[in-house]
A protein has these predicted regions:
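Long, hydrophobic alpha-helical segments
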Residues: 225, 239-267
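Post-DEXD/H (motif II) to motif III coupling segment of the RecA-like Helicase ATP-binding lobe
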Residues: 3, 8-73, 253
Length: 267
């Protein structure tokens, strides 16, 4: 018998190799809250465990009051004409580097997060280019206020992450600046009210797993708000890479029947 938790990760070569060698394991059970919509990944998953049986949706769990109420605020950052023109020919990684190092954008993230009530999780992708500078900005802004700010990356060991999680659950307005890889999957924070998507992504798994961090019901009954940052650097009719990623995320919210609103914010 094989039981695979977070079964969506079983598309990794190392795990599929193990599954292929378990020729005598006739009973296979895989559980997950998120399945990739890519056909190839679905086929791999079904090859490892068998046909998918969707027991219940996240929306149904929210409606039944099992999970916290969820609202997604899509904040489309509108850049000026000069910056749009400057970025029109950038390759994907160059666009990412421009976005994560944009001073006004990072200041907006810090101010937005600090203005929210309750505990907040800020998710980033690049540690040295984005996560650490954001953390330093939070520390500087909140100096002398007594408000706790934590930094989590792959370099922070599991024991320290657990300590941060436990401290946060006892706080009312703490901020965790964490890498997507360490805090988007498998970490449950009961007392979490706000999640800020500071870095672009179009991965359905990553988006839904990240949202899942904030769906545990809180003692105060406050719902969870997702702040999804999109970057509009479109030039004439050509959309930039990360704006297309944002469009994909909105499609995910629509499919999952999440409540969302789109707001334009000048940078």
């Amino acid at each position: 018998m094989v039981v695979g938790d977070e079964a969506h990760t079983f598309k990794a070569k190392s795990l599929t190799t193990i599954m292929n060698r378990l020729v005598n394991a006739n009973l296979r059970v895989g559980t997950t809250g998120t399945i990739d919509n890519a056909i190839a990944n679905q086929m791999t998953l079904e090859g490892n465990f068998g046909p998918v049986n969707k027991v219940i949706s996240t929306k149904e769990l929210i409606d039944s009051d099992t999970l916290s109420q969820l609202t997604v605020q899509c904040l489309v950052l509108k850049y000026g004409e000069e910056e749009r023109k400057l970025c029109r020919g950038l390759k994907y990684q160059e666009e990412i580097d421009f976005i994560v190092s944009h001073e006004k954008r990072n200041r907006f993230i810090v101010n937005l997060t600090c203005d929210q009530k309750g505990n907040s999780l800020v998710l980033y992708n690049l540690v040295h280019k984005h996560g650490k500078p954001l953390y330093d900005s939070f520390v500087e802004k909140l100096k002398g206020t007594g408000r706790k700010v934590f930094f989590v990356s792959g370099a922070v060991n599991a024991e320290e992450r657990e300590r941060i999680r436990e401290i946060t659950e006892k706080e009312k307005n703490a901020i965790i600046v964490a890498s997507v890889g360490t805090f988007s999957t498998g970490i449950n924070i009961v007392n979490l009210h706000n999640i800020v998507f500071a870095s672009p992504t179009k991965s359905q798994i990553r988006v839904l797993q990240s949202i899942g961090r904030g769906l545990r019901k809180t003692e105060d009954g406050q719902g969870t708000t997702i702040y999804d940052l999109a970057d509009d650097l479109a030039w004439k009719k050509k959309k930039n890479y990360t704006l297309n990623h944002a469009i994909q995320r909105v499609k995910i919210y629509t499919i999952e029947k999440f409540k969302y609103k789109i707001h334009e914010v000048p940078v």
